């Protein structure tokens, strides 16, 4: 029997980052993966979607240029080549993870893990361990909609395997991945419809932010139905109370459910709703030497959150640089046009916790770089605690928002104040100057 100091089950952004760090700390480490290295994020999530979104940006850039004297050209493309580009991106990053494992002497084991009488078995062989880290992720959740089982629908796990362009795409769901894929497909010519049963799309985002995004999606020609009552799904249409929405391809993007198979085999304690594994502040489960991270434990189901949780768990396992993770310092990003990025408390949440809450907002409409670049849609909003000038949260809507948010977050994470941002010298002309302008307005 081969034994390890640490066995990680799952090679997604939580699992592989944790494994590499443990190995760097001297732990004999193995990673077990039943599917593709890199997990959901790399293979059917973050990376493929950003590849498709980049295609949309290229098309939109050409359309925008045509307004200002550039010759307008009809967009033509071969969708299989776009898919091939996505596959090349994924393959390159898969190779990067394999390289990290090799460089740090992490054993990579392909196979299905299971626990039989408390023993870890993979491919018919027992594997021993001192510590175990579960990073088994999640799978698409498909709600019990009448007729959906009879339809040839796609999920986010299967969408990126399509080699035929969806000329008419209907998406059930209004969360981040649903909106991003709607944005990615529409500029290429797909007729896109979003169907959301909730009162609005992107309910986890700032209200002003989602209004900007929703308006832009509608300007692009994306149809959006909110508070929709789905009565039936047919083979080529979704039947709502007052309208029938036809489709060539149907994507059900209604969230994901944690894969609790191994957690249940181990008898780990779950949360009250039996949806996630219960962990402490160092991501240890109800059993000693067994840890869980990522989609398994709830919270932000984000790749970078899983990575941070993995590092937190490894710090506890190695008893080195032990720390806890501040959930208010995890950035949240939406990759549309404009982009949305945020972190920390919303205004409502801040007012519940603090007495003297202040908020300032400034639009990009007056920013020189934004005007020169035709990127004026959006704003910067910062929320602080007034007495000590502590940064509580921020929202940026605009071009490159997902990059700029870290300017504010870095100051917050280092326990800096809004005054320190106000005293910083920002290069001119940059979109980031709007951050400075907001800071100076307090």
Where are these regions (language model features)?
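Beta1/beta-strand and adjacent pyrophosphate-binding region of the FAD-binding site
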Residues: 1-12, 165-175
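Glycine-rich flavin
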Residues: 2-3, 20-27, 32-165, 198-202, ...
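Short hydrophobic core segments
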Residues: 7-9, 113, 127-137, 172, ...
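Flexible, glycine-rich terminal cap/loop adjacent to redox cofactors
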Residues: 9-14, 23-35, 47, 51-58, ...
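Hydrophobic/small residue at the entry helix of a nucleotide-binding pocket
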Residues: 14, 38, 177
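Glycine-centered short loops/turns at secondary-structure junctions
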Residues: 26, 189-191, 221, 415
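Glycine-rich dinucleotide-binding loop and its adjacent helix/turn
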Residues: 46, 136-191, 195, 223, ...
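FAD-site-proximal beta/loop scaffold in flavoenzymes
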Residues: 149-165, 245-319
């Amino acid at each position: 029997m081969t034994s390890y100091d640490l066995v990680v089950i799952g090679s997604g952004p939580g699992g592989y980052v944790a494994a590499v760090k443990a190995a760097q700390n001297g732990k004999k480490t193995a990673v077990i993966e039943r599917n593709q290295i890199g997990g959901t994020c790399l293979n059917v999530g973050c990376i493929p979607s950003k590849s498709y979104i980049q295609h949309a940006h290229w098309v939109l850039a050409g359309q925008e240029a045509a307004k200002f004297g550039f010759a307008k050209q009809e967009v033509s493309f071969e969708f299989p080549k776009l898919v091939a580009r996505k596959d090349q991106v994924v393959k390159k990053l898969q190779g990067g993870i394999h390289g990290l494992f090799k460089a740090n002497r992490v054993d990579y084991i392909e196979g299905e893990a299971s626990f039989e009488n408390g023993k870890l078995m993979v491919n018919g062989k027992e594997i021993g361990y001192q510590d175990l880290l579960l990073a088994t992720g999640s799978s698409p959740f498909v709600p019990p909609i009448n007729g959906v089982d009879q339809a040839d629908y796609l999920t986010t796990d299967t969408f990126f395997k399509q080699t035929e362009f969806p000329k008419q795409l209907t998406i059930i769901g209004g969360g981040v991945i649903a909106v991003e894929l709607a944005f990615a497909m529409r500029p290429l010519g797909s007729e896109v419809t979003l169907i959301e049963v909730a009162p609005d799309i992107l309910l986890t985002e700032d209200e002003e932010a989602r209004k900007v995004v929703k308006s832009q999606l509608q300007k692009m020609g994306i149809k959006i139905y909110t508070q929709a009552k789905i009565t039936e799904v047919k083979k080529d249409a979704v039947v709502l109370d007052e309208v029938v929405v036809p489709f060539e391809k149907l994507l059900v993007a209604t969230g994901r459910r944690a894969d609790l198979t191994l957690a249940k085999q181990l008898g780990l304690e779950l949360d009250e709703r039996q949806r996630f594994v219960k962990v402490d502040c160092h991501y240890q489960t109800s059993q000693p030497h067994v840890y869980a991270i990522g989609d398994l434990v709830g919270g932000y189901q984000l790749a970078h959150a899983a990575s941070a949780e993995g590092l937190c768990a490894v710090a506890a396992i190695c008893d080195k640089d032990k720390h806890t993770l501040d959930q208010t310092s995890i950035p949240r990003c939406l990759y549309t046009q404009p982009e949305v990025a945020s972190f920390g408390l919303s205004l409502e949440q801040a007012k519940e916790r603090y007495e003297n809450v202040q908020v300032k907002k400034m639009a990009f409409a007056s920013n020189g770089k934004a005007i020169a670049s035709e990127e004026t849609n959006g704003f910067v909003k910062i929320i602080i605690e007034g007495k000590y000038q502590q940064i509580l949260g921020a929202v940026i809507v605009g071009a490159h928002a997902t990059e700029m948010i870290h300017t504010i977050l870095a100051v917050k994470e280092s326990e800096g104040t809004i005054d320190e941002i106000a005293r910083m010298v920002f290069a001119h002309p940059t979109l980031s100057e709007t951050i400075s302008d907001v800071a100076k307005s307090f």
